[in-house]
Amino acid sequence: MSAIPKKCTVLVIGGGPGGSYAASALAREGIDTVVLEGDKFPRYHIGESMLASMRHLLKFVELDGKFDSYGFVKKPGAAFKLNKNKREGYTDFLAAGGPNNYAWNVVRSEADNLMFQHAGESGAKIFDGVSVKSIQFENPTEVPDGEPNLNPGKPVSATYQIKETKEQGQIDFDYVVDASGRIGILSTKYMKNRRYNQGLKNIANWGYWEGCNKYAPGTPRENSPFFEALQDESGWAWFIPLHNGTVSVGVVMNQKLATQKKQEADLDSTEFYHDTLNKISPNLRELIGDGKFVSNVKTASDYSYSASSYSFPYARIVGDAGCFIDPYFSSGVHLALTSGLSAATTISASIRGQVDEELGSEWHTKKFSDAYTRFLLVVLSAYKQIRHQEEPVLSDFDEDNFDRAFSFFRPIIQGTADAANNKLSQEELNKTLEFCAFAFEPVENDEDRSKAMSAMQEAVDNGTGYHPDLSPEQLKAVKHIQARRAMRTSDTMNIESFGTDAINGFVPNLVRGSLGLRKQEAMSGDMGGANGHVDETNGVTVNGHHQPEGVKAH
């Protein structure tokens, strides 16, 4: 190992996807960057199914070609079966973005090593087997015990230990990026602002199989990953084929219920894993077929968490160091890369004097929080359906599949709302958010739902915005729908692709050699609608038909 420098401009703690990506982007700007990774590469990690956005993000640091030529399993889309009585929905990456819009299923030890080495090839100084033990602050701030400390002071140095020799050292820096994964040294040790999502308090058990069947053989969807809701509504299972000949198969279940079921059946984790697949995941078990289980059962729990802030001046938090939602919809690496790009963009902007550190760090927190919240809404609404399979939330009553629902989900499932400079992403993303919100606060009574929708149509037709003859419950249904649909207007929320997302009056400048932030240019017309105008009426799909759903804007 070459000597670790005594000083650098940016220290990146952690060489996983988020840290390596941030380091690559920074180093390509000529910024002196050091990466310290606690483990030795290659090292194991779960989270093997990527989103279509990854290609666009990797292309920015010229890493997409390495992934393309490596031999990972190409992922043309993904199948989701949320209801045992309906055929699975499918999100088609190729239909959405063309024949080269596929993603990959990856062996993370190999994919993460590719990204780590690429950071070095981009000019960063990379060191694995070196763990950061503590961070030192200039003028540290104190808060009462148990209280979060959202600005612990200016970070100036880190103490590290070399795993092999136990030798300790210190490195000074101007900026720090915490990409330490689940450890989350800044959030857990200094800011103390991590919080777990009780609604996603699940446990995951998984392992690897050989000799399994393929999903949809002989079709354009062949060998896509498959996800299935468990038939007792306790969770879901995944089936992800990998290029080394194995298939990753996992089960995610409510933690309390899983513990109870294991105790009642007197099963250990391995027995419980196989019992779940055999009894309440029939379609996935059919895909396993005569496959052979070739690993131990691995377990993770309490893995869904977030934080109130992902930065403070001279510090940025990225990826799992800040938050993790759930394996569903494969959001982990996408959030790691987009937050890594945000960290690099805002640090570069600060170094170039385009913004001060207060604004730069705030921009990063808002950007990371926005991406996290969008995926959280999707995942929560999906769990609503998984845990109430006889009360459709994502599909209309007369549908036999979830294709329409997932056409709304498409920009988030594929990550294109953050990665692609696509004019449609605003409209598509708003549809997704509106749809997720509608699912998140469902109207239990079908008659109330129908009456509310009819009244909303009448309000548009009569031009008064008045909903006549509604009961309190029906009015509540109207409010549930309309409150979330307000996201379509410019004065409430604007969510664009990463390259056009304006936060605090600044948008990213995603150009190598001048990466940073620039002032938002004046736009002609209003920004509320997808075509540059505020929509006076919004719509929802009901039983396959588009229905105006909003009152007139005043």
UniProtKB/Swiss-Prot annotation:
Documented EC number(s): 1.14.99.-
Reaction(s) the record says it catalyses: ilicicolin B + FADH2 + chloride + O2 = ilicicolin A + FAD + 2 H2O + H(+)
Biotechnology: Ascofuranone is a specific inhibitor of trypanosome alternative oxidase (TAO), and quickly kills African trypanosomes in vitro and cures infected mice. As an essential factor for trypanosome survival, TAO is a promising drug target due to the absence of alternative oxidases in the mammalian host.
Source domain of life: Eukaryota
Annotated residues for binding of chloride: 331-332
GO biological process: secondary metabolite biosynthetic process; terpenoid biosynthetic process
Pfam family, one: FAD_binding_3
Annotated metabolic or biological route of this protein: Secondary metabolite biosynthesis; terpenoid biosynthesis
InterPro entries: FAD-bd, FAD/NAD-bd_sf, Flavin-dep_Halogenase_NPB
Induction cue: Expression is induced on AF medium.
Any one GO molecular function term: flavin-dependent halogenase activity
Record function comment: Flavin-dependent halogenase; part of the asc-1 gene cluster that mediates the biosynthesis of both ascochlorin and ascofuranone, a strong inhibitor of cyanide-insensitive alternative oxidases and a promising drug candidate against African trypanosomiasis. The first step in the pathway is performed by the non-reducing polyketide synthase ascC that produces orsellinic acid by condensing acetyl-CoA with 3 malonyl-CoA units. Orsellinic acid is then prenylated by the prenyltransferase ascA to yield ilicicolinic acid B. Ilicicolinic acid B is further reduced to ilicicolin B by the reductase ascB.
Similarity remark: Belongs to the flavin-dependent halogenase family.
Name recorded for this polypeptide: Flavin-dependent halogenase ascD
Organism: Acremonium egyptiacum (Oospora egyptiaca)
Organism taxonomic ancestry: Eukaryota, Fungi, Dikarya, Ascomycota, Pezizomycotina
